[in-house]
């Protein structure tokens, strides 16, 4: 059985998602209210997920610090990015490595009926993430690992 958890720092978004889940009759989905940096320090969430997917909310280094601590060793992190993210991926190599990951693939595509490019960057988790990551709230975005 597939279980899904939706994490967000804003209750407003989670309330909306809970309404959608209820109206559509979706099962095995929970919403979790934490900042990414804080939730990843909770034993019940840290390195518990086979796959973590993010929307494009930050640069790749920051997204890795937000998301890789949630991924089990052997699992994957999929980052949704705008455009061709190759330069951003190159800048994030150190962060990916420090957090226990390795870039596995990047899939580039255009949104249907448009010429708007997007990317899915797939990072495989090879080693546990050090307990020092993620750093305290705000630091991953202010001072990305480079």
Where are these regions (language model features)?
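Short alpha-helix immediately C-terminal to the canonical SAM-binding loop
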Residues: 13-15, 85, 89
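SAM/dcSAM-binding transferase cores
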Residues: 90-146
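Short, small-residue-biased leader/transition segments that mark boundaries at the very start
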Residues: 1-2
């Amino acid at each position: 059985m597939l279980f899904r958890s939706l994490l967000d720092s804003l209750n407003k978004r989670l309330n909306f998602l809970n309404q959608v889940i209820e109206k559509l009759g979706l099962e095995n989905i929970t919403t979790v209210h934490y900042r990414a940096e804080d939730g990843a320090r909770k034993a019940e969430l840290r390195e518990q997920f086979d796959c973590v997917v993010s929307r494009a909310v930050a640069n790749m280094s920051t997204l890795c610090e937000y998301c890789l601590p949630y991924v089990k060793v052997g699992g994957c992190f999929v980052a949704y990015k705008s455009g061709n993210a190759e330069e951003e991926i190159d800048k994030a190599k150190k962060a990916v490595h420090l957090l226990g990951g390795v870039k596995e693939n990047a899939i580039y595509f255009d949104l249907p009926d448009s010429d708007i490019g997007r990317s899915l960057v797939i990072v495989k988790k090879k080693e546990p993430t050090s307990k020092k990551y993620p750093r305290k709230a705000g630091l991953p975005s202010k001072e990305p690992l480079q």
